[in-house]
Regions:
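One-carbon transfer enzymes
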Residues: 1-92
Length: 92
């Protein structure tokens, strides 16, 4: 039986914990959708979401649409069986 293809959507540090748990339990995460990198602090350091850091560590494709309502085709193209959302930050 083929593994379920999962797209994960999340941004907050809580989301990172959910994603790590899925990966450690051998779920088939085929893509991660998260908010775009943001400038943080007084020095305006460009910072990526923690979820993106985890995805890159596991060589999972990352998608960072500014507005998911206008840019969802890349998710559809992955043909996921399931989408899991945890604190994504936009209405889906």
């Amino acid at each position: 039986m083929e593994k379920t293809k999962i797209v994960f959507m999340g941004t907050a540090s809580f989301s990172k914990e959910v994603l790590v748990n899925l990966l450690e339990n051998d779920y088939n995460i085929i893509g991660v959708v998260t908010q775009p990198d943001r400038y943080v602090g007084r020095k305006k350091v460009l910072t990526m979401p923690e979820v993106k850091e985890v995805a890159l560590e596991y060589n999972i494709p990352v998608f960072q649409p500014a507005n998911i309502k206008n840019d969802y085709q890349s998710i559809i193209d992955l043909q996921p069986d399931l989408i899991i959302t945890a604190a994504y930050g936009q209405l889906v």
